[in-house]
């Protein structure tokens, strides 16, 4: 099984150049083609410009997913609702980047025979990772909790792509 989510110019310093980084990452896809396993499944983010380059040639199945398949219903402070495999999925995670990752994970789970209701239940219980789109609020029992008229989001985004994705998720908010 191979899952390709995206490729962005990150960790270049470890590879020397973007071209070398691309080559090193493509080697991972090649490992699936060369595998002796009977079932070799590649799950590919079809929205990424490098999708074709990361689609292994000798596999038994290629699953391409796109953001448009998610049919996003809502995205607000409580989370995101979207469509997957005929079911409405809710997750407390926000942003298209998280939906893309959930689509990859959902297709991965389906490839292993996990049913959609189980996937939906798991996604509904997801929590943000500290420092990645993490919302900070006053504690539930704090007397001023209901008067808090601002939202604090902590994110350690450090590339242009990740900052743009974060700003798109929290549009209209002031940024510091």
Segment roles from a protein language model:
Residues 1-151, 172-173:
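Acidic, Mg2+-coordinating active-site environments of NTP-dependent enzymes
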Residues 129, 160-176:
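Active-site beta-alpha connecting loops in nucleotide-dependent enzymes
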Residues 152-158:
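Switch II (G3) loop of P-loop NTPases
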Residues 48-49, 158-162:
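Short beta->alpha connector loops
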